[in-house]
A protein has these predicted regions:
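Central regulatory/effector-binding core of bacterial HTH transcription factors
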Residues: 30-92, 160-161
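Beta-alpha-beta core module
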Residues: 93-99, 103-105, 165-211
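Flexible hinge/capping segments at coil-to-helix
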Residues: 26, 95-132, 216
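Hydrophobic residues within well-ordered alpha-helices
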Residues: 1, 35, 76-77, 127, ...
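A late-sequence structural motif
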Residues: 45, 194-235
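Alpha-helical "hinge/linker" immediately C-terminal to small N-terminal DNA-binding modules
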Residues: 1-30
Length: 235
């Protein structure tokens, strides 16, 4: 019953979105753009484009849906979101991708009063000795396993998370140390980020469904985003 209810709601959401897109197709540039986003400071790159587009076309409105990579990918594939902003590499075989120049880096998040907090960086040998709170997506993609040189069963993983905000409370309460990308600790004033050494980058991608029939508003956003990224590259 819950499965069919979820699928029915997805059909209703997609139908509503299509009706809005069709309504604005032949009029002045306006409409709604839905973007699914993982947690990343790279979101600032998208916001810069959103502001530029909205300043020029004030009847274009944006709707941001936060979530983990797998949930966002599913919604993009089903056409519920126009775009998705991803941290790291998933299976994008059903989608078009555009890599951002901006990259996050992986590291360890701990309390400011922890003895490790003053370190300029942290090595895999040090990390492997700690009780860890890990990103489920990061572990699933194998990138953390590869960097650490160990499998999940060989690590002391006390908890996992899909979005960092609640993981930050676990770190504050001394449950363990979080493996995360940079910037997310800013939501918790008592936490600090220590980068991995050697550095481990997390690439960012803007993605959309293959053969997507964009609304005029979504097409304008994509063109503006690509132009902004190309402009940065030329600077």
């Amino acid at each position: 019953g819950m499965y069919f209810r979820k699928r029915a709601q997805e059909i209703v959401d997609l139908t509503d979105k299509m009706l809005v897109d069709l309504e604005v197709q032949d009029y002045d540039l306006k409409g709604d753009i839905h973007i699914g986003c993982g947690e990343t400071t790279g979101m600032k790159e998208l916001i810069a484009t959103m502001k530029k587009v909205h300043d020029e076309y004030p009847d274009i409105h944006f709707h941001i849906h936060s979530g983990n990579g797998l949930d966002i990918r599913e919604s993009v594939e089903k056409g519920l979101y126009d775009f998705g902003l991803f941290v790291g590499k998933l299976d994008f075989s059903k989608m078009e991708t555009y890599p951002l120049r901006y990259k996050n880096i992986w590291g360890l998040i701990c309390r400011k009063d922890d003895p490790l907090a003053s370190l300029p960086y942290i090595t895999k040998e040090q990390v492997c000795e700690l009780p860890l709170i890990t990103s489920r997506q990061g572990m699933r993609e194998q990138i953390l396993h590869d960097w650490l040189g160990k499998e999940k069963k060989d690590l002391n993983i006390v908890a996992t998370y899909n979005l960092f905000y609640n993981a930050g409370f676990m770190v504050e309460q001394k449950l363990g140390y979080a493996l995360s990308i940079d910037g997310l600790q800013q939501s918790h004033e008592d936490l600090v980020f220590i980068p991995f050494e050697p550095k481990l980058e997390a690439p960012l991608f803007l993605v959309w469904k293959k053969y997507q029939a964009f609304s005029k508003a979504a097409q304008k956003f994509l063109e503006a985003f690509k132009a902004g990224e190309a402009g940065e590259e030329g600077q």
